[in-house]
């Protein structure tokens, strides 16, 4: 089996050296070349034909975003962004994901060499899964048609979503058409601290419903979506007749914090048949066990199909475990018919 061929673009000689060391330490991949900026990278891509590109966000001569936009239009390939953990860095990284980057790695703020080497296995996984993808010229997901507003839903109704790699754009596609009468929504997307706030703010500008980073103790009214903060678990709890968000620092589950399983298990316990669970694109198995618990408690569950996923790992694991009621294309995850059936309190059979 041939090795995954990686090309790294970063203006820092230290980062290029570290990335080379990390990639070459894994037997199934090799660093074929490195470049200090996108203009050099352009020629190296033609010469070495890499399977995956790692791309620094901020560089001289041409920044990573401008290069990514041209690359995805002219020669689409899996790209993993390398970003700083800053407010500006998170906004630029979200823009990169919108343009077609499949994932991102965050640079440690201190001890870059030690921190990056500690991330070695995670970086390898972020490269390994997208390397299998066959990308077409990138066309950003079009804004879906806005769904009609129905009667305001009972505060008992709930939509919960879990995602990882490729999830930022998939979540946007699900939330953007929702009317203000939609059920309350809880979302766990694997992201580090800082990024979740920027992600929520971006969605809030694009959507009719209100979207924000979740805070401990908040209620979950209709027409509002809450995103689990980076490095914190989010659970659903109850306070008398109302749903309430619980944010905590529990240990990572499935190597993740926030974890989709943590959210789904709590929703199965406290919402049961009033909930709809959705698992979107992502690698690994986080969410599979929690999704299995949801239909046992009476909920309806939906998995994104392989054709519309960036990485089919999380939906596949949930399907294989037996917790998925229905598998649909991303464009069909949320529909007018589904909202009407939730509103009527019917079991969902799309």
Swiss-Prot record:
Active site: residue positions = 164, 190, 286
Gene3D superfamilies, per the entry: 3.40.50.2300, Methylesterase CheB, C-terminal domain
Domain spans labelled Response regulatory: 5-122
The reaction(s) catalysed by this protein are:
[protein]-L-glutamate 5-O-methyl ester + H2O = L-glutamyl-[protein] + methanol + H(+); L-glutaminyl-[protein] + H2O = L-glutamyl-[protein] + NH4(+)
Localization annotation: Cytoplasm
Q: Which domain of life is it from?
A: Bacteria
Q: Which GO terms describe its molecular function?
A: phosphorelay response regulator activity; protein-glutamate methylesterase activity; protein-glutamine glutaminase activity
Which family is it part of? Answer: Belongs to the CheB family.
Q: What is known of its domains?
A: Contains a C-terminal catalytic domain, and an N-terminal region which modulates catalytic activity.
**Could you tell me what this protein is called?**
Protein-glutamate methylesterase/protein-glutamine glutaminase
Which organism does this sequence originate in? Enterobacter cloacae
Its gene is cheB
């Amino acid at each position: 089996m041939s090795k995954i061929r990686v090309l790294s673009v970063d203006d820092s000689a230290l980062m290029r050296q570290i990335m080379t060391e990390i990639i070459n330490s894994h037997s199934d991949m090799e660093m074929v070349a490195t470049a200090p900026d996108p203009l050099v990278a352009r020629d190296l891509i033609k010469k070495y034909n890499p399977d995956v590109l790692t791309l620094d966000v901020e560089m001289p001569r041409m920044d990573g975003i401008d290069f990514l936009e041209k690359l995805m239009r002219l020669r689409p390939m899996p790209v993993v962004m390398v970003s700083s953990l800053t407010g500006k860095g998170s906004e630029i990284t979200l823009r990169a994901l919108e343009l077609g980057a499949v994932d991102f790695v965050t640079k440690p703020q201190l001890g870059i060499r030690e921190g990056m080497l500690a991330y070695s296995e995670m970086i390898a996984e972020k490269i390994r899964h997208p390397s299998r993808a066959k990308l077409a010229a990138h066309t950003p997901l079009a804004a879906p048609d806005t769904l009609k507003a129905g009667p305001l839903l009972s505060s008992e109704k709930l939509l919960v979503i879990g995602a990882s790699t490729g999830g930022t754009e998939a979540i946007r596609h699900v939330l953007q058409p929702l009317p203000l009468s939609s059920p309350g929504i809880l979302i766990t997307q694997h992201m580090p601290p800082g990024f979740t706030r920027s992600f929520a703010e971006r969605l809030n500008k694009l959507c009719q419903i209100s979207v924000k980073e979740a805070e401990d103790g908040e209620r979950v009214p209709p027409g509002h979506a809450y995103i689990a903060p980076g490095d914190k678990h989010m659970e659903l709890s109850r306070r008398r007749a109302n749903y309430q968000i619980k944010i905590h620092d529990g240990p990572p589950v499935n190597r993740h914090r926030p974890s989709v399983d943590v959210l789904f298990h709590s929703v199965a316990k406290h919402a049961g048949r009033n909930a709809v669970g959705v698992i979107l694109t992502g690698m690994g198995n986080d969410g599979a066990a929690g999704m299995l618990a949801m239909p046992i408690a009476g909920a309806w569950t939906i998995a994104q199909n392989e054709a519309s996923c960036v990485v089919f790992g999380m939906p596949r694991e949930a399907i294989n475990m037996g917790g998925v009621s229905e598998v649909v294309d991303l464009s069909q995850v949320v529909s007018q018919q589904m909202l009407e059936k939730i509103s009527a309190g019917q079991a969902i059979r799309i």
